[in-house]
């Protein structure tokens, strides 16, 4: 038999393959291309955006990747290499579970990249991880469309590129944990199709289980979509002939397979669910499910065009762009006569469900777990892109059903153009602007550029449809279209990166590497100096999660996976707490000491946050990002208590401490802990009759200038006069002792003011030479906390001045601030020293510890209970003298341990709730998967392989018979000598339709 010329869409004969490696490459080179093409495209975009190593200073850190996630990667890297624990972490909010953070942010298999690569290139490893996720998304989508839609290899590259470079994928490089959704979604969808078509189950179970483990949040969204896709494919998508009983049987088995998915992922799902139940579920308060729409439907039109980045804040629109090739093929999908009506109905169902989910606010909230997302809206929009590209692929694979004419092509182009013109006319009513962080549409680079691309793709589709029988021509046109699609995707990515930078800014490499390395180095030196278990903090911040990278055990932290009990307590003590973010602003010796903050690192620029009574221990010199010599100094708090200590058991009379006045809360905490609070039992209720005060309130006089004062509920509204030049609120008070004075301003409506202080008076009796107080601002960012005013000689008169800020860009705008209470308190160090010394007498002497285990001895006296400043949450196993005991919750924040009088050995060990059960179900799930493969899927695969073999044999016989017929015809005409039979064979091969379906492949 004559040999065949190898066409790009033709099977590769064994004799042309050479060795096994070449055979493998011949079969899979287009899959490799689907992986590497998006990687190269994003690298080109990064290079033009000056990301390192193409630029000197650029990094991929932006928004939460800069402020949160990079630190989580640092922490999980420490845990992997033995410097921490996967279960528990001491660098967050006084400590807390870590599996929730892993499951919410870090459980992706791609996280191994930053874990295994050197820490010195962690930013580059994050970029490599991003690239690998986008490349793998291209690969998995290529697998999906070649198996499901039977598209040819070269043409699959067009659409795998469009999918992997969708707007969602490019923009969410700043939230890389969500990219796993676009990686595993095609495999899950293919698994559903395999299950319905031929009964294979493992292809559904394994990718969905991995997705549930990789990211709990996106896994939840894919779970919803899985149900929708199963419904679509069972009733509309499959070509299998099913009976009524088949629908019931398959649905029952599908449910069983989903249970196996949950069994295999329970070791992650259960701990994550526990972590979320500590506060995330209730974080946003009672959700508002009242009906409302979120945009005009026509506003989705530019979302299908390139360069359509709106915003990552709550004004943003759904990120559904996935290439103009997809946009132009969508109307052709419904015009295609080769696509059956049931598939059109089914895909329309999916599009409608996803559209109305985005359009109707309560439906949108359900996709986000019943809450309105904080920035980054429509986090499931990649599902729409998946559906749209799938529709485009189906249309392209059946171009013969369109019978494209110039009229049809022109009609599609004019139809899209008409919609564009309609939107452009309506755009002023949508209040878009072209600068700033509000949403906007660039008419030229979105619509003009998009319509040019639409014209190119429509012309390409027209010529492909007219040359269906010429494989070489089709391949050339497809190759050109792939190049154009790639250029479009690359330019769109670069445009998105620039607009992200304009809105929220990318961080520089040195701003991270220099600061974090210096912090890790000084922490290592501190560990050498004192290797015991203690807490430490710092007075400076790159971001609030620095402690995770430094390895410091502190209170500063930011995460969506929060323990609201402990962050509320941190606020109660007067530290900074905003939303779910806590920071070491607002510290006092009393709070620091009782929470065990033994060391504080200072960079000599934030003296307002450093207590003057703390003792310097050592200094560490380094160079900052500007190559300037800098010094970090470590200070010791001489009164810091252990992680656990004995207190008076009357503490159990307090349910919690209020957050209206942090000084009262601190007074009550230490007073009750030392037995100095008097309680009365009246009619079954326990009342507070008095307590010791370590802070006493100072009398204040309030005066204003250029300000109107009016009541605002139980608060006071201070409004600047219309012609005000310097609207101020003056607070006057007198120092009673030489101890520190502290300030806290209470409000329910934060509006920033500038803060000043003076204790100097001029000859006219007015205060002069005001200096900045604290950070210079209050009610701004993290500056809503206790502020140390300073220490003064007794009798010194002091003025604290608040300046209401005027708006220079909008001078007519009414400016104001609202304050409920001006709290100025005098600290009494002698009383504090007296009582902190009592607590020092019975501390937990820790002899052994790691991140999830603590062991030590402690001596209890009659009427005492052991207080640990470890946040109260399930998972701790506590033993006293080898016997398990049940803890009690103290102040709705901490773990308390009842002890009998005497000396005891107390051990605590943490295991995430549900983890052990999850490991058991994982083992069972894997065993069931193996059984399913051996008893079911293996046989199905063998049967499909046999069918494939028979089909290939039949095709070979048909080809051989056709060639013999041609040869006989040639010989009968006596033209053998003048005709190249091999060329005739090749012509016959090339006449085959490159778009024909190969059902056996699926």
Label every PLM stretch briefly.
Residues 63-76, 109, 250-253, 257-337, ...:
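Periplasmic/ER-lumenal interhelical loops and adjacent helix-loop junctions
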Residues 218, 345-365, 371-515, 903-952:
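Contiguous transmembrane helix-bundle modules in multi-pass membrane proteins
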Residues 1-52, 249-253, 459, 475-481, ...:
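Start-transfer (signal-anchor) and selected internal transmembrane alpha helices
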Residues 13-98, 501-504, 509-544, 548, ...:
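Hydrophobic alpha-helical membrane-insertion signals
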Residues 39-141, 161-182, 221, 276-283, ...:
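Membrane-interface coil-to-helix junctions
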